[in-house]
Amino acid sequence: MDSFRPHLAKVAGGLALDRAEARAAFDDLLSGEVTPVQAGAFLTALKVRGESVEEIVGAAEAMRARMTRVAAPENAVDVVGTGGDHSGSVNVSTLAAIVVAACGVPVAKHGNRAATSRSGAADVLAALGVRLGLDPAAQARCLDEAGLCFLFAQAHHPAMRHVAAVRSELPVRTIFNLLGPLSNPAGVGYQLFGVAQAALAEPLTRVLAELGSRRVWTVHGSDGLDEITVTGPTQVVALDEGRLCHFTIDPREFGLALRAPEELRGGDPADNARSLEAVLAGARNAYRDIAVLNAGAALVVAGAAQALADGVAQAQDAVDSGAARATLARLVRASNDHSNGQEGR
C-alpha cells in the first residue's frame, strides 16, 4: 500500500512517528490493505525501538474510530489491564468490576479471552453463565438492568481481524496488546488500568490523558501483577483532570494481610468461576482481599469514594451484604434475556 510505505520506512529507520502519522499508519493497518510482510516489519520495528506516547495515542485514535460503540452513563468506569503478567492468577479485575457495580457505579468492563493466561475475563464470565458478543443495544440494556456490561473485545473491534494473522506469527507482544485496553467501546472517562511492566505506567497514563480520560489510576504490583496486589506494595500513577501524581499502596494500611503469590494462583475458567462464586458467597481469602482492594480503588477513580479506605469498606460491604452476588445474577439474566440468538458461551 503506497500510503503506508513512508511510515514503514520512517519506523524501520529508527525514527518516531508523530501523532498524525501514527494515526494514518494504523488507519492503513486496520483497513486490511497493508501486506502481511509490511505489517510484521512495522510492528516489529516499533516494538524493538519502543513505542512513543504520540505513536500510541495516534494508534489508539485509529482503533477507536473503527470500534463498535456502546452507550454508557458519563460516570461509567472500566477495570482493565494490559495482561501479559504470566501470573496465572484468578480473575481479579472481573470480580472487582462486579463489586464496583454492586456499589452503584456503572461498569463497562472491556476484555477478551485469555492470551497469556488460562482464563481471561471472557472465559470466566462465560463459565459463570454470562452471554458474550451481544450487540450494542443489548449491552446498553445489561448496563441499565445490572449496572454492569461486558464488552467482548473481538465483537467490538472487527478491524483487528486484519492484523490477527500477523500478530499470531510474531514471537513478541506488540502495540496492539496495549491498544485493546486503551479502546473501551463505551468511551469511559474513568479507569483503573493495570500494567504488567512498571515502565509502561506513566506513558500509558499520559496516553489516556491525551485521549480524554478524566481520572485514571494506572497500577503495577511489586509482584508483577497488572493489578493492585496484596502480596506487597503497588506503584500507582494517577491522573486527575490533567494532573499526574505518583504514590504507593500498601494493603496492610487497609487492614489486609500480606498474602503469598500462591494464594492468588488460578486455574482454568471453570476453576476461576468457582473461586469467584466462593468469594461472593462469603469466602474470606486472598482473592476476596485483592478484589475489594481493586474495587475500592475503582470507586475512588469513579468519584464514589473520597479515599481508598472508604472505597475498600464499601467494597467489603457489597460482598458481605450479598449485593455483589445479586449483581452477577442480574448480569447473567440480562445478558441471556437480551442475547437474541447472538454468540453464546
From Swiss-Prot:
Database matches in InterPro entries: Anthranilate_Pribosyl_Tfrase (IPR005940), Glycosyl_Trfase_fam3 (IPR000312), Glycosyl_Trfase_fam3_N_dom (IPR017459), Glycosyl_Trfase_fam3_N_dom_sf (IPR036320), Nuc_phospho_transferase (IPR035902)
Binding residues annotated for anthranilate 1, in chain numbering: 81, 112
Name of protein: Anthranilate phosphoribosyltransferase
Coiled-coil ranges per UniProt: none
Residues binding Mg(2+) 2, per UniProt: 226-227
Residues that bind 5-phospho-alpha-D-ribose 1-diphosphate: 81, 84-85, 89, 91-94, 109-117, 121
Binding-site positions, Mg(2+) 1: 93, 227
Gene Ontology cellular component list: cytosol
First and last residue of the signal peptide: none
Metal-binding in keyword set: yes
Lineage per the UniProt record: Bacteria, Pseudomonadati, Pseudomonadota, Alphaproteobacteria, Hyphomicrobiales
Keywords, sorted A to Z: Amino-acid biosynthesis, Aromatic amino acid biosynthesis, Glycosyltransferase, Magnesium, Metal-binding, Transferase, Tryptophan biosynthesis
Named cofactor requirement(s): Mg(2+)
EC number: 2.4.2.18
A GO term, aspect molecular function: magnesium ion binding
Subunit structure: Homodimer.
Catalysed conversion reaction: N-(5-phospho-beta-D-ribosyl)anthranilate + diphosphate = 5-phospho-alpha-D-ribose 1-diphosphate + anthranilate
